[in-house]
């Protein structure tokens, strides 16, 4: 553009980044294949510090395609570039160099842990053909109004999932894996459940989150609150009572009310309705415990935590009418508007922030 002067080195760097952005679909699709081929789990099982060659990997994965090692090498190179894998050279007997690949901390979270949980299903759901189609409608949604997913399917993502058993399975698996990993970290980091006699998990689904809380704090009575058809199919958990209802109508009473990743699916008006019902369900000096992502006040941050949350905000923009990630000030404003006397940001667990709204 006229008037914009850059040095040759700045131009070089900027153009290289532009090309990387232009081909940025490569990384998620390579990761999708790596997960579907069980590459990451196989490398993780080898253990930290143990390296595998592409040929080793093809053999362990029982691949019959004679070209598989060469193709795997190209996939592994991409993953190593983004620190999903580590790599080192190994000199062969003929003097040629072969590259070997190993586990990294990022690979740890994209592989099954001791609980069988992983972030991998979260990646698979976002690369699934169903939600991918919605991105082709984002431009129209911005120009004409509405939500990209609704334009693609005529309904929101939650209603669609209830009508598509295969996608529903993929969706639920992604939520379960992410939730298990995050809740485990929350329970290691946050001590605000100590001393509670009862806790209500609003929008608690099958009760898995509440079961994790009660397993650590067995004297707490847990109330898992969700829509009747959701809790009707939920498994029995010791110390957990399933209660069906509508959070927009009322919320069961408890010492504390827990809401994890609920508010980012709703508009400010809907969040306020939910919070006012929570306020009515609490005695004085009791609290709502909120677990949500917090988006920075100032745009332009380049750290991984910021990139992660702005990605999730874009996901909510495309998939969920009214859904969005919020700043700390926006959460505090919601708490104040609902009548709570204090707001406190307590701690962070894998980019999910714990906040307390006290009555």
Swiss-Prot record:
Q: Which residues are responsible for catalysis?
A: 264
Q: Where is this site: Determines the catalytic selectivity of hydroxyl groups in esculetin?
A: 126
E.C. no: 2.1.1.69
Q: What's the reported outcome of changing residue 316 to Y? A: Abolished catalytic activity
Instruction: Give me the reactions it catalyses.
Output: bergaptol + S-adenosyl-L-methionine = bergapten + S-adenosyl-L-homocysteine
Consequence of substituting residue 261 to L: Normal catalytic activity
Outcome reported for the amino acid change (mutating residue 226 to A): Altered substrate binding
Q: Where does S-adenosyl-L-homocysteine bind?
A: 179, 203, 226, 246, 260
* Consequence recorded when altering residue 315 to N: Abolished catalytic activity. Strongly reduced catalytic activity. Abolished catalytic activity
Mind listing the GO molecular function terms for this protein? 5-hydroxyfuranocoumarin 5-O-methyltransferase activity; O-methyltransferase activity; protein dimerization activity; S-adenosylmethionine-dependent methyltransferase activity
Q: Give, from the UniProt record, the effect of changing residue 122 to F.
A: Slightly reduced catalytic activity
Mutation: residue 265 to I; reported impact is: Increased catalytic activity
The UniProt-reported impact of residue 122 to H is: Reduced catalytic activity. Strongly reduced catalytic activity. Strongly reduced catalytic activity
Highest taxon listed in the record's lineage: Eukaryota
UniProt record, GO biological process: coumarin biosynthetic process; methylation; response to jasmonic acid
Q: Where is the signal peptide?
A: none
Phenotypic consequence of residue 315 to Q: Abolished catalytic activity
Question: Cross-referenced PANTHER family, in alphabetical order?
Answer: O-METHYLTRANSFERASE
**Oligomer and partners:** Homodimer.
Output this protein's name. Answer: Bergaptol O-methyltransferase
Organism, per UniProt?
Answer: Kitagawia praeruptora
């Amino acid at each position: 553009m006229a008037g914009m002067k850059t040095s040759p080195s700045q131009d070089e760097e900027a153009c290289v980044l532009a090309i990387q952005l232009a081909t940025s679909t490569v990384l998620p699709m390579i990761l999708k294949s790596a997960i579907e081929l069980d590459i990451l789990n196989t490398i993780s099982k080898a253990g930290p510090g143990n390296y595998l060659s592409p040929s080793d990997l093809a053999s362990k994965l029982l691949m019959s395609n004679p070209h598989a090692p060469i193709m795997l090498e190209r996939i592994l190179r991409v993953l190593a570039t983004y620190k999903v894998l580590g790599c080192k050279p190994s000199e062969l007997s003929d003097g040629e160099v072969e590259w070997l690949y190993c586990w990294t901390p990022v690979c740890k979270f994209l592989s099954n842990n001791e609980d069988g949980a992983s972030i991998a299903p979260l990646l698979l759901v976002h690369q699934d053909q169903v939600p991918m189609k919605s991105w082709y409608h984002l431009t129209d949604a911005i120009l004409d109004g509405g939500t990209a997913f609704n334009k693609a399917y005529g309904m929101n993502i939650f209603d669609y999932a209830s009508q598509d058993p295969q996608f529903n399975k993929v969706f639920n698996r992604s939520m379960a894996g992410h939730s298990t990993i995050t809740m485990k970290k929350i329970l290691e980091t946050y001590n605000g459940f100590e001393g509670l006699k009862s806790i209500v998990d609003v929008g608690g689904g099958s009760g898995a989150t509440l079961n994790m809380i009660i397993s650590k704090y067995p004297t707490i009575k847990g109330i898992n609150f969700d829509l009747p058809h959701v809790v009707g199919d939920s498994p029995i958990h010791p110390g957990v009572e399933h209660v069906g209802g509508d959070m927009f109508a009322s919320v069961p009473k408890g010492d504390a009310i827990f809401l994890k990743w609920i508010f980012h699916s709703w508009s400010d008006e809907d969040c306020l309705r939910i919070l006012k019902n929570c306020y009515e369900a609490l005695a004085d000096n009791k609290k709502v415990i909120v677990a949500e992502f917090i988006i920075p006040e100032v745009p332009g941050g380049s750290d991984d935590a910021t990139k992660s949350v702005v990605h999730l905000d874009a996901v909510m923009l495309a998939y969920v009418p009214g859904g969005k990630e919020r700043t700390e000030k926006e959460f505090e404003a919601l708490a104040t508007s609902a009548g709570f006397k204090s707001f406190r940001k307590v701690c962070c667990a894998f980019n999910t922030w714990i906040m307390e709204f006290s009555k």
